UniProtKB/Swiss-Prot annotation:
The keyword RNA-binding applies. RNA chaperone that binds small regulatory RNA (sRNAs) and mRNAs to facilitate mRNA translational regulation in response to envelope stress, environmental stress and changes in metabolite concentrations. Also binds with high specificity to tRNAs. Homohexamer. One of its GO terms (molecular function) is RNA binding. The keyword RNA-binding applies. One of its GO terms (cellular component) is cytosol. This is RNA-binding protein Hfq. Belongs to the Hfq family. It comes from the Bacteria. Pfam families: Hfq.
Length: 86
């Protein structure tokens, strides 16, 4: 059986562990920048310098990382490529 894939958690966790700066756009049009320090099912903690923002996920419209985020490991990607060749 295939492993369950949670895109949101994987994306946020990569941003958190890699400390990739992000821009977060809220549904009211407000924009904030920072590094994701932590997140749970309902909130995420964004840090910018010595300022912290606890943002409720239901208020988030878009998260834009400053660099590309690869959601699959190179091993997984190589496995896919070899499957496609067969």
């Amino acid at each position: 059986m295939a492993e369950k894939f949670n895109l949101q958690d994987r994306f946020l966790n990569i941003l958190r562990t890699s400390k990739i700066p992000v821009k977060v756009y809220l549904v009211n049009g407000f924009q904030t920048k920072g590094i994701i320090r932590s997140f749970d099912n309902f909130t995420m903690l964004l840090e910018n310098g010595n300022q912290q923002n606890l943002i409720y996920k239901h208020a988030v419209s878009t998260i834009m990382p400053e660099s590309f985020v690869r959601l699959t490991s190179k091993q997984q990607q190589e496995g896919k490529d070899s499957d496609e060749e067969e």
